[in-house]
Structure formats: C-alpha cells, structure tokens
Curated annotation (Swiss-Prot):
Localization per record: Cell membrane
SMART domains: RAB, RAS, RHO
Gene label: rapB
Family: Belongs to the small GTPase superfamily. Ras family.
Single GO MF annotation: GTP binding
Modified residues (Cysteine methyl ester): 202
Keywords of the record: Cell membrane, GTP-binding, Hydrolase, Lipoprotein, Membrane, Methylation, Nucleotide-binding, Prenylation
Membrane topology: Lipid-anchor
GO biological process, one term: negative regulation of cell migration
Cellular component, GO annotation: plasma membrane
Propeptide part(s) removed at maturation, as residue ranges: 203-205
Name of the protein in its database record: Ras-related protein rapB
Amino acid sequence: MGKGNGKSKDSKGSEKSSTKTKFFVAVMGAGSVGKSALTVQFTQGVFIDKYDPTVEDTYTKTFELDGEQVCIEVLDTAGSEVLVAMRELYMKNAEGFILVYSILVKSTFLEIKDIVEQLFRVKEEEEVPIVLVGNKIDLDAHREVSTNEGKQLANSYPNCDFWEASSKDRINVDNVFFSIVKRIKEKYKKEGAPVKEKKEKCIIM
C-alpha cells in the first residue's frame, strides 16, 4: 500500500487543525495480521486488501466519544519480525496499545504474550491500557484461535479489553479504537492525572 508522510488530511486533501483531547496509541502484532487494514479502515473508511509490510506510519482522526471530542494518533508499527529493536521506543512513547493477532494463525496469537511481557517490562507499570484484537473474523470458517482463547488471554491482563474484528467487513473496528481511548482515560482517572488538551492536526470528520 502506498502511504503518505504521516500528515493528516481531510477528504479534500487539506490539513485541519483543532484543539482536542489527544491520545497516542500504538498498534502492534505479528506481520500480516491486519494492523494496517484495521488502522486505515478506522481512520479513512477504506479496506486494504493487499499486504504491504509497514515500516512505520502514523494516522490521526478526531471523533466524538461520550460527548467529548477526542483526537487519536495511531502509530501503525512494523510486524514484529521486522525492526524488533524499535519495539521499546513505541512502547515507551504510546499511552495505549492495540495488540492484533489473526484468528487464522495460532502463532500470531501466541506471539501476543511475548509482546505483553516486553510491554510491562518497558513501561514499568502495573496497568497498561490494552485492547486485544482477534482480526479476520470474516474468515471464521478457517480459524485456529477460538473466541474463548482470546477472552481468557485478555482477562489475564489488567486494564485489557477484547474484541474480535474484521477490517474487511468493518466489524467492531470502531469499538476497538473507542475501547482503547476509554482504557487510557480510566487509567488517568485512577492516577488522578489530568488529560491535557493540545492543538493538533487531526482529521475532522
């Protein structure tokens, strides 16, 4: 997939600027699980049906959640087989994490555990906002990972939600990103830390 320089543009190609509550989220997981497809479907409403290994790309979108305008900046990271050394940088900077596996490939699910272990080690926090996503449920007949396995793994971590999704059919795509914002806000609320408003360039929908 051809990608731009990471700047956010509206449907007419012009950059928008607005003061919003902003959250920085990293999407992580093995290669070919659909991280880019999930991210682009949410931010641009387009399904990518061709696999093009990502090095790193950033997308932003503004939307209303619980009566509040929020801006989410999403870092679409490389598959874990590429640029593994950069994982720690993503982990240090992001406020929340969407961890994606393919329900069609068991090894991508098992790899999530390694990512989470490294995540907690790098963040040095008891609770890290996480949303676990079993992607490609439009191909459910070929699944290797059951829904219950996904739920059990999510339940083993604090502050973690679980969704099964389809980037192709846009099933639960919005819920995934809404959930991670809610998890981040809950964490700040527990810590008594204010969520700062920043003037950022975001897609105005």
